[in-house]
């Protein structure tokens, strides 16, 4: 028994038995985590089973697996595929006639990281849609262009919805208080033609004024971009970061007119950074908005315009494979916020 357990799971027999008790030693978990990072399939299967637990340990293990799956944590090549295949096997077991009503399989019948990973692995479209329904429930679009249908939850060219972008960016702001991020908006109201950015800025200026770094996530019709108001040498600046084709002049003028509400008087204080980064990240404008907020959160006192220009320049030097990996991993990291 010692030989079998040690060869399969890198654990001693007492450590293996402890996995089925309420308390699992940090030493045993560390050994399993290390083996999983190195791609050990037996240990991946074992950890996926532990992640089913509805307690702090189960949550910790599930989060560890998802961090590997989404690229937040480094692992062996194809670690994401090994993990989601293990989750898919569990999902199949959870839905057989014997176990489908068992509460121990709760995480595979309700929105969870495990269920999301299982859904990413299945190639059966009807099962994929069934899993997506459990994860997403009923969602409604804030704009006509948003794709909230369940059939494309794992699609690599899916446009992010307002709610998904809001959940992810709110999560980032909680981790870093340096930014104030507003709920995503459309630039122009579809029926009244009201400039919604202008209205929100008027309200903020009338109430408490702008924060040191105030971020607006704006949809121009079929595209997300970042609009940042910040202070540089006690002067308010406005920065628009657009990762697709240049905006048309009407859209630019709407943003400029809204920005002047804050006291900006010179167009030179409004900076448009426009670089197409989406050739290998289709419909990835929301992903870049999320990543931009990450960058700004970690930029400290650096000039935001310099930070974002350098990012855009560096991103274009990445290989197609690296840009594609950014697309896959960032989508997974963003959707995790909607699973919490």
Swiss-Prot record:
Active site: 223, 285
MF-aspect GO terms: cysteine-type peptidase activity
Enzyme class: hydrolase
GO term, biological process aspect, one: proteolysis
Protein purpose: Effector proteins function to alter host cell physiology and promote bacterial survival in host tissues. This protease targets the host cell ubiquitin pathway by acting as a deubiquitinase in infected host cells.
Family: Belongs to the peptidase C79 family.
Name under which the protein is recorded: Deubiquitinase SseL
Species annotation: Salmonella typhi
Classification of source organism: Bacteria, Pseudomonadati, Pseudomonadota, Gammaproteobacteria, Enterobacterales
